[in-house]
């Protein structure tokens, strides 16, 4: 019984256990199913999210690729346009070169035609000369002389016709200038102050009656004065004042002193003019010497040869591009000395070289060569050292500097010249033209003096009367005018006047 109860109990327990176990298994299965469904949903959601992100990334990548493609397209378009522009420019250059080649070919063709014409002209001329020589062989001396005279007359007539044309054109130009005078008044008002300090001097008179005495009977006094001094004496309506005009300051100053002495003395006639002129020349020499001594005193340069001091004084009356050469030399000496002092170099030698660096300008209108070459020769002649000579030669680069002081002098020269307002180009060009005119006239044989006057519109040439007759004087005037025309550029018409004067002097005792 007990065994049966135990068996029943066991069976019941087994049944209950089975039921409970089955229930638990079913519960676990349901939970597993729920978990599987949940995981499946979660996986689906994650898959959707991954898909969405992949789509977004794909779209971004596509957009980025599109942008890169657009940028590449723009770059290629830009390169294409640049290439097209370069091609167009090359085409333009090629086109211009073709035009230039065409023009050169045309010019060459014209030149060839001109050469052919010149060749034919030469052949014709040779033929004419052969005929003339054949003809002259059977002529007398008088007949040949007459032919030469006729040809010379024809040549002069041709030159006169050209001169007439130039004079006419000059008058038309002057008329046009006068028409513009009102417009240019403001500019012209500055001209006397700008140029007056260099090219003109005024002399005050006690009264206007003195003007008549200065002119003299039939103008003999004024003619004598201008001939002796080489300066224009301008007498106009300005009350109690006459004007002296010359580009050469030394001549002008001597003329001023001469005229002041004549006015003070009151006796004005040719002999008195010559006497006062000689006195004024002596006075001028004294002024030149004093100016040179003052320059050496201001700069502290000692031991200069007396002739060098005299040449320094002459620089007071010379200008370079409107700058006073003596003032410029003093300025260069002081600037160079200051720089030498800062660098611990030889101050005295530098100052001496700076003062003498333009000494050649005192004679460059009288001696052939550049002012540096002339200055070096002068310094050598009067015992200056090789260093000083090198400073003179090297300040314009004509010789290499051999010492640092030479470099300082060149630098100081450039500083002084480059200072605002120190120099003027147009005046120097004008003066060089006048000096060149005088040199051309002086290059002819038997010429005593030559003066460029009337602002460079006239050259007066004084010849030796014993060696030149009237016919030769006419010929010389023509030849000088021709040479100036060929070698000098000048506005308007230039007049050449050759003066031949013979004086006979006797004394009654």
Curated annotation (Swiss-Prot):
The keyword RNA-binding applies. The keyword Transmembrane applies. Residues 199-259 form the KH domain. Its main location: membrane. The chain crosses the membrane at residues 1-21. Its EC number is 3.1.-.-. GO terms for molecular function: RNA binding; RNA endonuclease activity. It is found in: Cell membrane. GO terms for biological process: mRNA catabolic process. Residues 325-418 form the HD domain. SMART domains: HDc (SM00471), KH (SM00322). GO terms for cellular component: plasma membrane. Belongs to the RNase Y family. Endoribonuclease that initiates mRNA decay. This is Ribonuclease Y. It comes from Pseudothermotoga lettingae (strain ATCC BAA-301 / DSM 14385 / NBRC 107922 / TMO). The gene is rny.
